[in-house]
Curated annotation (Swiss-Prot):
Presence of the UniProt keyword Ribonucleoprotein in the record: no
Keyword hit for Transmembrane helix: no
Record InterPro entries: MADS-box/MEF2_TF (IPR050142), MEF2-like_N (IPR033896), TF_Kbox (IPR002487), TF_MADSbox (IPR002100), TF_MADSbox_sf (IPR036879)
Protein name as catalogued: Floral homeotic protein APETALA 1
Disulfide bonds: none
A Pfam family of this chain: SRF-TF
Stretches assigned to the K-box domain: 88-178
Residues in MADS-box domain copies: 1-61
Region (Disordered): 184-206
Single Gene Ontology BP annotation: floral meristem determinacy
Length: 256
């Protein structure tokens, strides 16, 4: 005897209705997953319970992409078949579409913050965990890249400073070598000629003409030695020559 056709109608018992909803929802999600895997199809499933809880499934967790694709396709089809009188209606639908998209983004944001997770199924929680893990991997990769670039920059600066220090040290050593060679050459010259080091340059002083005229002058001695005349002796001779006529003049006056 064949099985009779079951009549579809609302289940009056709340407990039975909730149990049936849970079983059928799980079966529906399973069928959506099977068709997406077997047929390589993009599937998006959205279910609201009688209490307003949302249950969804999407291929590879790309619900937003599938909905945007659906909206673009539906909007393009409506634009082709809709008359000009339906422009206001289209704007109203566009508003509702954007509003629904905003609500979806806000809900995803709450999920990313760890809020409002009670209404999510184990599959949805697993998808959310995968998304967070992927985001953490991207964050760690970017952080490591910035740290690596910072380390390379510091190493480059360190190398430049070391090269500059080496160049300055080499210049100092060369300068010390030159000064040491000059000092040794000067010491050898002083040792060979027994001469003191040259005095430092002095400023020229202006001398009185009298001092210039009474500089010691050389004279030739009878012995053949070249000597310089004593300036005091020259001064004394000049005084004697100057006083002798005066003394003679006085003697002549007394004699008269």
């Amino acid at each position: 005897m064949g099985r009779g056709r079951v009549q579809l109608k609302r289940i009056e018992n709340k407990i039975n209705r909730q149990v049936t909803f849970s079983k059928r929802r799980a079966g529906l999600l399973k069928k959506a997953h099977e068709i997406s895997v077997l047929c390589d199809a993009e599937v998006a499933l959205v279910v609201f319970s009688h209490k307003g809880k949302l249950f969804e499934y999407s291929t590879d967790s790309c619900m937003e992409k599938i909905l945007e694709r659906y909206e673009r396709y539906s909007y393009a089809e409506r634009q082709l078949i809709a008359p000009e009188s339906d422009v206001n209606t289209n704007w109203s639908m566009e508003y509702n579409r954007l509003k629904a998209k905003i609500e979806l983004l806000e809900r995803n944001q709450r999920h990313y913050l760890g809020e409002d997770l009670n209404a999510m199924s184990p599959k949805e929680l697993q998808n959310l965990e995968q998304q967070l893990d992927t985001a953490l991997k991207h964050i760690r990769t970017r952080k490591n890249q910035l740290m690596y670039e910072s380390i390379n920059e510091l190493q480059r600066k360190e190398k430049a400073i070391q090269e500059q220090n080496s160049m300055l040290s080499k210049q100092i050593k060369e300068r010390e070598k030159i000064l040491r060679a000059q000092q040794e050459q000067w010491d050898q010259q002083n040792h060979g000629h027994n001469m003191p080091p040259p005095p430092p340059p002095q400023q020229h002083q202006i001398q009185h003409p009298y001092m210039l005229s009474h500089q010691p002058s050389p004279f030739l001695n009878m012995g053949g030695l070249y000597q310089e005349e004593d300036p005091m002796a020259m001064r004394r001779n000049e005084l004697e020559l100057t006083l002798e006529p005066v003394y003679n003049c006085n003697l002549g006056c007394f004699a008269a």
